[in-house]
Amino acid sequence: MLKPLLKEVESLTEKIKESDHEIEQIARRDYPETALLEQVSGVGPLIALTFVLTVEDKDRFQKSRDIGCYVGLRPRRCDSGQSQPQLRITKEGDPYLRTMLVEGAHYIISRRGPDTDLKRWGLHLAESGGKRGKMKAVVAVARKLGILLHRLWVTGEVYEPLRNHNLRQERKKIAA
């Protein structure tokens, strides 16, 4: 009874591996800029290719921060007099790219994700966020991940995972 199911699972797993390999080949051959984006932990060929194909033109935005609005990872605002509540995210823009960025953010914040400034920031948000802190942190990290990917694409810089941490350490040495 289980043998046919196991064979089906093996067959599907093999098809997924073939598709992943094909996506990787397309990214390498037709979109070399994806290699810049894959420097970030949590970003593989699928997320990088989705980002490049969705945004299309790296010069489309004046500021990298605008990516958050474009993808729908910006909190909805409803200002009224003195009150400025932060509501849920807008969910405007491409839902597939938003999903991919959130998946990458889940990996970054998880235990398996390597130590980076983005992970430290996300974990700090999760700890100080109360009941829903982890989910809010994931969305915030997804937004920052989109901003980071756009910035790397525009500048062509090499990604430094602990850039802010290293700068703080250097400042402490200078001050001491």
Question: What are these model-predicted stretches?
Answer:
Residues M1-A176:
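A detector of single, family-specific signature residues
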